[in-house]
Amino acid sequence: MALRNIRKYGDDVLRKECREVEEIDKRLLVLIKDMLETMYDADGVGLAAPQVGILKRLFVIDIGDGPLVFINPEIIETSGKQIDEEGCLSLPGKMEEVMRPNYVRARALNEKGQEFEIEAEELLARAILHEYDHLNGTLFIDRVNK
């Protein structure tokens, strides 16, 4: 396992749409472990593959309840509203208030290739939606409440 370089705001890779993961192989499993290690080292709660320069539809999250891996995620449903401050490992030191849905239902594959659905509220919903945005080239500053 190794720490990966977190791409910072201004890097073109952060604005690109990611491709689906076609195969969960040894290289992808190493990437997932590296992403988790990098996220924990940076005191983050989430990290998406484009943040380490990989244009794959993959992100990891840990809000304190253990790591979650999302491969080829889909957002099925959202509802409600919440406004809270967000930050991003690609924009160190920047915090802004962002309105997001308070509830999300998502579907993805885990690192074993098993499909799962998750229902989340509050911080976990915010983290899922924040990381999902990265896969489409969107940063939280694009959603700042003006």
What spans do the regions from the language model cover?
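Positively charged
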Residues: 1-146
